[in-house]
Each structure stands twice: as C-alpha cells, then as structure tokens.
C-alpha cells in the first residue's frame, strides 16, 4: 500500500483520568482554609485555572473566597518571609552632614 493512501491510525494508549481537585461535597467558602490554601502559590498568589484544573465557575468562586479571606486577614496578601528578614547594616563612615552657610 502506498504511504499516502494508508489510513491514519492513532495509537490507543490507556490513560487515567485525574480526580477533580474539588469534590461535590466541598463548599467553596472563605472559612474553608484547607480548600483555599490548595489554590494559592508559595508566594501567596492565586494560581491560574489551567494549573488548578477547575471549571470557570469554580475558579471564580475560589478567587472570591481567597479575596474575602485576605480582607478578613485569614490569609496574607503576600507570603514573602524574606521581606521581614533584617540584613546586617554597614556602619557609616562619615558623621552627620552639616550644611555650610
């Protein structure tokens, strides 16, 4: 049989469908911190819908719940520990500057 006339065959590989990240019994609410924290990055940013594998409606509800939790200070706006680390200061060589008149 000629290559151009040969029918196209797709290899049939078995695949395991991933479980949805949110079950039917899970309530998307700002008080449900164990659920909300799964959809936040290490830096405290809301992960995208593609990364979360959520539907559009679920992503919207998660986003609203995260924002409510941030406003009520259940969640930090930023999760940056390095911001508060104190660096060793260098001593000043010159004394206080004086203005000449």
From Swiss-Prot:
**Which Gene Ontology molecular-function terms are recorded?**
small ribosomal subunit rRNA binding; structural constituent of ribosome
Instruction: Give the region (Disordered) as residue ranges.
Output: 1-23, 82-101
Q: Which domain of life is it from?
A: Eukaryota
Q: For this UniProt entry, what's an example GO CC term?
A: mitochondrial small ribosomal subunit
Q: Name one GO biological process term.
A: translation
Give one Pfam hit by family name. Ribosomal_S18
Keywords recorded for this protein, A-Z: Chloroplast, Plastid, Ribonucleoprotein, Ribosomal protein, RNA-binding, rRNA-binding
Compositional bias, Basic residues, is annotated for 1-19
Q: In which compartments does the protein localize? A: Plastid, Chloroplast
Q: Which InterPro entries match?
A: Ribosomal_bS18 (IPR001648), Ribosomal_bS18_CS (IPR018275), Ribosomal_bS18_sf (IPR036870)
* PANTHER family listed in its UniProt record: 30S RIBOSOMAL PROTEIN S18, SMALL RIBOSOMAL SUBUNIT PROTEIN BS18M
The UniProt similarity line reads: Belongs to the bacterial ribosomal protein bS18 family.
Cite the NCBIfam families for this sequence: S18
Describe its assembly.
Answer: Part of the 30S ribosomal subunit.
Q: What is this protein called?
A: Small ribosomal subunit protein bS18c
Species the sequence originates in: Drimys granadensis
């Amino acid at each position: 049989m000629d290559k151009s006339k040969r029918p196209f065959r797709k290899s049939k590989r078995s695949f395991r469908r991933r479980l949805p990240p949110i079950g039917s019994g899970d309530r998307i609410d700002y008080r449900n911190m164990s659920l909300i924290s799964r959809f936040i990055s290490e830096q405290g940013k809301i992960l995208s819908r593609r990364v979360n594998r959520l539907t559009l409606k679920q992503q919207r509800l998660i986003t609203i719940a995260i924002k409510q939790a941030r406003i009520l200070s259940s969640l930090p706006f930023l999760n940056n520990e390095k911001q508060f680390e104190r660096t060793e200061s260098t001593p000043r060589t010159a004394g206080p500057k004086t203005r000449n008149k």
